[in-house]
Amino acid sequence: MELVLFDISPESPRDLYLPLSTNHRSSSVNGTLEPHGVTFFIIQGLTNLSERKMILFVILLLGYIIILGGNSMIIFVASTDPKLTSPMYFFLYNLSLVDMVYTTTTIPKMLSGFLTDVNTISMPGCFLQMHFFIQLGVTGYAILTVMAYDRYVAICNPLRYTAIMTRSIKLLLIMGAWGFAIFCTLPATSMTWKRPYCGPNVVRNGWCDLSSVRRLVCADTSVDNIVSVSFAILALLTTGVLILTSYVLIGVSMLRMGVAQRLKAFGTCAAHLTVVSISYGSASFVYISYRVGNFSAEDRIIVSVLFSALTPFLNPIIYSLRNKELQESIRRTLSRFRPAAVIALKDVNT
């Protein structure tokens, strides 16, 4: 998941954004200016890809299908299999749900734009997309933090694990993750929503990205930028430090274990550690790509789009490959549907 509270675009983005007019109130883009200002935005980040357009469409479509299918399977087995009672699967259920909704805020709209060449979005729709994309991204990091704490309790306090991770504590941790995300997201998006938009309405990105939309404001946004960066740092530092602390304590505890116990403990947190590394690594790569001059404007946007879907795409694959209980649960689920499919096929043949 890509955390986009940061303004990751270059300081002088002449190649990425159209220059704003000096008099926003007297300018008009495609005749959309009305007395009350801009009523919709035009998403133009992915409209000039020529032959790469269809390739990106196929990649996004297949990736989105896998994201929906893989995460839906995890949600189904985690909520219906009585053998998956560990709090870890409850948190994984919530992470998969967040991943599905997170990608749904942007990918369907982009796919529709590829097919129809209609890239407009209403002003309320733009800000709803912006808010939920950022909020769900932060929620994903917060849930990964909760899962790191869960692994810490399971490895460092195994005898007290069930007493600590009660149902009420699980719900409280998930509610805290959502509340933390809302707290970090709402100030920046609400400030951007209240700003005047009375001139250019072309968003140079694949979706209504916060920094891209804010460049269209016909007012001073220095305070907005400070607020956005402050809450972005808060979100990244809080989740990053807590995850790092959990794994440092896990590592210290593993040093006191025997080889067999150490391997077993590492196996229980390997999938989560892999997902965390990919999440922060992909966000860092996107940030760096906007600071390197070798990337063209279109390439930067493509990188941002693809990496925003990378973690939701890989999550179900990683957890399915690294978790034997989840693998067995998926096999049991598929075996329940297989006899019904065979019977239905026989009825058709007869």
Please provide the spans of the model-predicted regions:
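Transmembrane helical core of 7TM receptor-like proteins
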Residues: 1-350
